[in-house]
Design a protein with these regions (language model features):
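Short arginine-rich
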Residues: 46, 69-82
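GIY-YIG nuclease catalytic motif and its immediate N-terminal context
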Residues: 1-41, 45-57, 62-69, 86-88, ...
Length: 110
């Protein structure tokens, strides 16, 4: 039986925009904070993927997992095409998720 909760599929990148990491979480603010601090070892931490570029919300975990799996199979150009309408300038969306001041966030992420 499926449970209804909040799940997010998201894309983060590094300061050079050279890596696109796709993940899924049930707590986007917590997970973005983990990426930004680098406290969770793994691919995203190794490549310093700390800037949130894109996210989607789902109410069912099965749908979020399916979408994450789908996006991970996409080419880089297709992922860029997905990001562009929501975030054409590739700005870090983390401050709006974390409730941070935009100016202070820019200082911390450089």
């Amino acid at each position: 039986m499926s449970r209804d909760y909040n799940f997010w599929v998201y894309i983060v990148t590094n300061i050079h925009d050279s890596v696109l990491y796709i993940g899924m979480t049930n707590d986007l603010a917590r997970r973005v904070g983990e990426h930004r601090s680098g406290e969770v070892a793994g691919f995203a931490s190794a490549y310093r993927c700390r800037r949130l570029l894109y996210y989607e919300h789902y109410g069912h975990v099965e749908n979020a997992i399916a979408r994450e799996t789908q996006l991970k199979k996409w080419s880089r150009s297709k992922k860029i095409g997905l990001i562009a309408p929501m975030n054409p300038r590739w700005e870090d969306l983390a401050p709006e998720i974390l409730g941070e001041d935009q100016k202070m966030s820019r200082l911390r992420s450089t």
